[in-house]
């Protein structure tokens, strides 16, 4: 949504990879050939718009079909006004506000083989507002990683 990104976008990327790793659990997808990307969109307005889309008079696509945001919102729900507060591009904000309200899915339904902690971490990394996501230190200090964390004397 924004042209300038901070480290928060890396947390989003790790969250997407985390979700895709959850798909590799047999309990979540029994047929390995049916495993797929978490958000396999073809474009994402405004940074990578669909060049074939019909647009309104200010250049905003009239359809959101196949926009990556549609796929994201199908999972995490549409953002609230406060969750959109970081968006500075007026066209992007208008585009977001045109999405019909929908709730987040139950992550347990999508990933029945994931532990409660794994799903909690996934949800935290996939928060729409980048400033609401945990940072790397918060994630690494999460109790979920207690059994695998190595401490260094350096």
Regions found by a protein language model. Give the residues of each.
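Short acidic/histidine-centered micro-motifs embedded in hydrophobic/aromatic stretches
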Residues: 41, 75, 90, 141-143
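Regulatory extensions flanking the kinase catalytic core
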Residues: 97, 124, 131-154
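Activation segment of protein kinase catalytic domains
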Residues: 25-42
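Conserved end of the kinase activation segment
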Residues: 1-9
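C-terminal lobe substrate-recognition/regulatory segment of protein kinase catalytic domains
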Residues: 48-60, 66-124
């Amino acid at each position: 949504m924004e042209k300038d990104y901070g480290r928060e976008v890396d947390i989003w990327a790790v969250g997407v990879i985390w979700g895709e790793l959850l798909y590799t659990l047999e309990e979540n997808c029994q047929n390995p050939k049916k495993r797929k990307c978490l958000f396999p969109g073809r474009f994402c307005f405004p940074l990578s718009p669909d060049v074939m889309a019909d647009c309104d008079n200010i250049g905003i696509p009239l359809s959101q079909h196949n926009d990556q945001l549609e796929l994201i919102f199908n999972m995490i729900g549409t953002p609230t006004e406060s969750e959109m507060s970081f968006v500075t591009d007026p066209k992007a904000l208008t585009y977001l506000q045109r999405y019909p309200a929908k709730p987040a899915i139950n992550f347990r339904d999508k990933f029945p083989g994931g532990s409660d902690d794994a799903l909690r971490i996934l949800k935290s990394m996939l928060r729409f507002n980048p400033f609401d996501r945990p940072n790397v230190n918060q994630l690494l200090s999460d109790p979920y990683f207690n059994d695998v964390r190595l401490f260094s004397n350096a």
